[in-house]
Structures are given as structure tokens and as C-alpha cells.
């Protein structure tokens, strides 16, 4: 049997631990026997990121901008224990965070619904899609530990040298400080992606922050969403028979648990990170969740929504049997292939008939 041909290489980002093992198995057993696979390969394993001072992550994002479509394996975001385990030069930032910052756009995560696996929340009869803002907040934060008494200030220096200062806290002892930021342009792109995706999929869109507490930071998100919706999408939503709904994040959680599903839940970066894991677990498993980063510039990056499955990897190293669920990683490859079908021969379109575009 002749292999399906590819006309343009696509970006492949390898990863860590057990998912790295699965990654190679999927290629060897499901892809390479049938496709003349052409990828521009980047090893985002923690050892290679450490060797290159994380430059390999930056280069993989640039390649995605060049070729338009990428598929990514799960990767380790190091903590103190990983620093010791891998003898790292420094505690490298999340590769996902770096890639998201460079590509912008929105991460859409949805459960893989199959017969025989019922949601733990009995009212849920339809999938719930999490739209996670892909830039800023805690993932691009700067942090500092303070050893003793002192004054912490938030300082903005304008181009003309003018300074604006806000007191953060008068420390009486040791503590920690964190500075976060976001960009109006990125929030606007997030809003457009969410509204367009809702129209494409004919689903209601929910958005939630904590603007009653964060009266400038979170309120900016709320205001930008509402302004864009009123000016550009309100009529289209009415014609499509769908709605845009804003509420506080705690109220949204309560409503979600009582809903039947079938909507898109737009969240800020951290909220989306947490809630997507909750949604996936309640629908069955973290290994049954798709994830795609959609950039307003036309870039797509597909991956599984779960991590590297560390415990299984340690068992694998000992020669013990594991039963790691590979479904979400397989779906990342199928969605990647489906999206890139124009770069392949026509036969590849039929190879993954169940794969769905974002």
C-alpha cells in the first residue's frame, strides 16, 4: 500500500515522560505506516529546553507562525523538585505559556464524549467547551520574595518619564509579591475568537471574571467583551438564536454545575486552566479532553489537555506495566491532520474521518 503524501512539513513539538513514550508509539503504529510524515521537529523535552536555555521553545513557536499548524506533546513545567531531578540551570517557564504568548489567540478545550462514559454531573448531557485566554496573568507574572519589613509599590513609567505609583503593601515581615499584566489587544483577540467560535458552533457563550473585586484588571476584560459584542456580534447572535452571557466567576461555577451543558465557557488564563481540568474529569478523564490554541492570525496548535503522566513514567522506567490513556494525544494528531488537510494529498482527508475542526 502506498503511503499518503504530504506537500508541506508541519510543526511537531515533542515532550516529556510517559506522553513522550506514547507520542512515539502513535507515530510508529498509527501514522508512519500510512503517511509519508513530514514534520519540522522540535524537542521540547525538559533536558533539551535546559540545554538550549529554552530557546528551542521560542523556535518552535516561530516555526508554527511559518507553517500555520503545529501538534504538541505534553511537557514538564518545572518546580523546585524538578530543578533538582533534572539539574536545571533555572526554573524554566511553562513552554505552553511561552508559545501562547507568542501566538496569542484562545485555547479551546472540550471533552471527548463517547458512549458508555457518563458524566459525573448527571445534569450534563452535552459537552462544555472551555475557552481559555492564552496570554498573560499569572503565566507571565513577575514574582519576588521579600525577607523583611519594607514598602512594595506598583510603578508605571510612561514614555515621557512620568511615573504613576500605587502602594501594594507595607510589609512588617517576610512575604511575597507578584505582578501581573495583560494587553487590551490580546483581550480583544480573545473576545473575537470566542464570539466567532460561538457563531461557528451555534453555541451560547458565557464569560466570567471577578470584576466586583478586581475593579480595574478584571473589569477591563468585562468591558472589552461587552463593547465588542454590542458593536460587532449582537445582531449575528440574535440571528443565530444564541446568547452571550456575563456573570461573576463564582456564580458561573454554580450555574455550570446545574446546567445541561452545550455552551462555551470563556475564562481568563488561570480560571480556564483550572476549570478545563474540572470539566474533563467530570466528563470522564483528563485523557479525554482535546485542546487547540487558535490564533487570530490563523495559527493552530493542537495538543492533549493533560500532563506528562509522571507516575506512569516512573513505573515504565522500572519495567512495570502501565495502562496510560492515549486517546487525547491521538486526537491531537487527528485534529492536526484534519486541519492540515490542504497541505496533504486528498487521501489524508479520509484517514481521520472523525476528526473535527475547531
Could you tell me what each predicted segment is?
Residues 5-8, 37, 65-69, 123-127, ...:
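Short coil/turn connectors at secondary-structure junctions
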Residues 47-163, 270-274:
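N-terminal glycine-rich phosphate/adenylate-binding segment common to multiple enzyme folds
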Residues 256-353:
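Glycine-rich phosphate/nucleotide-binding loop
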Amino acid at each position: 500500500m502506498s503511503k499518503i503524501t504530504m506537500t508541506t512539513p508541519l510543526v511537531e513539538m515533542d515532550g516529556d515522560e510517559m506522553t513522550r513514550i506514547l507520542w512515539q508509539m502513535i507515530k510508529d503504529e498509527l501514522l508512519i505506516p500510512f503517511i509519508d510524515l513530514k514534520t519540522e521537529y522540535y524537542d521540547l523535552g525538559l533536558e533539551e529546553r535546559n540545554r538550549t536555555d529554552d530557546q528551542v521553545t521560542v523556535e518552535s513557536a516561530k516555526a508554527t507562525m511559518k507553517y500555520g499548524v503545529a501538534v504538541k506533546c505534553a511537557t514538564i513545567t518545572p518546580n523546585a523538585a524538578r530543578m533538582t531531578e533534572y539539574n536545571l540551570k533555572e526554573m524554566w517557564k511553562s513552554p505552553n505559556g511561552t508559545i501562547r504568548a507568542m501566538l496569542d489567540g484562545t485555547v479551546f478545550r472540550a471533552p471527548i464524549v463517547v458512549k458508555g462514559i457518563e458524566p459525573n454531573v448527571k445534569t450534563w448531557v452535552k459537552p462544555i467547551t472551555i475557552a481559555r485566554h492564552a496570554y498573560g496573568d499569572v503565566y507571565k507574572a513577575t514574582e519576588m520574595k521579600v525577607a523583611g519589613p519594607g514598602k512594595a509599590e506598583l510603578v508605571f513609567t510612561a514614555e515621557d518619564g512620568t511615573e504613576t505609583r500605587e502602594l501594594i503593601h507595607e510589609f512588617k515581615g517576610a512575604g511575597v509579591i507578584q505582578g501581573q499584566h495583560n494587553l487590551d489587544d490580546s483581550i480583544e483577540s480573545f473576545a473575537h475568537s470566542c464570539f466567532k467560535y460561538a457563531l461557528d458552533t451555534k453555541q451560547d457563550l458565557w464569560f466570567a471574571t471577578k470584576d466586583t473585586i478586581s475593579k480595574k484588571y478584571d473589569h477591563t476584560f468585562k468591558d472589552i467583551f461587552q463593547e465588542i459584542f454590542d458593536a460587532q456580534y449582537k445582531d449575528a447572535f440574535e440571528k443565530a438564536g444564541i446568547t452571550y452571557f456575563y456573570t461573576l466567576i463564582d456564580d458561573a461555577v454554580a450555574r455550570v454545575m446545574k446546567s445541561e451543558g452545550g455552551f462555551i465557557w470563556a475564562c481568563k488564563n488561570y480560571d480556564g486552566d483550572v476549570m478545563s481540568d474540572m470539566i474533563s474529569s467530570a466528563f470522564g478523564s483528563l485523557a479525554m479532553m482535546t485542546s487547540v490554541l487558535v490564533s487570530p492570525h490563523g495559527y493552530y496548535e493542537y495538543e492533549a489537555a493533560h500532563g506528562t503522566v509522571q507516575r506512569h513514567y516512573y513505573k515504565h522506567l522500572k519495567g512495570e506495566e502501565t495502562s496510560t490513556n492515549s486517546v487525547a494525544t491521538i486526537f491531537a494528531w487527528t485534529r492536526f491532520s484534519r486541519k492540515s488537510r490542504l497541505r496533504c494529498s486528498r487521501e489524508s482527508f479520509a484517514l481521520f474521518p472523525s476528526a473535527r475542526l475547531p
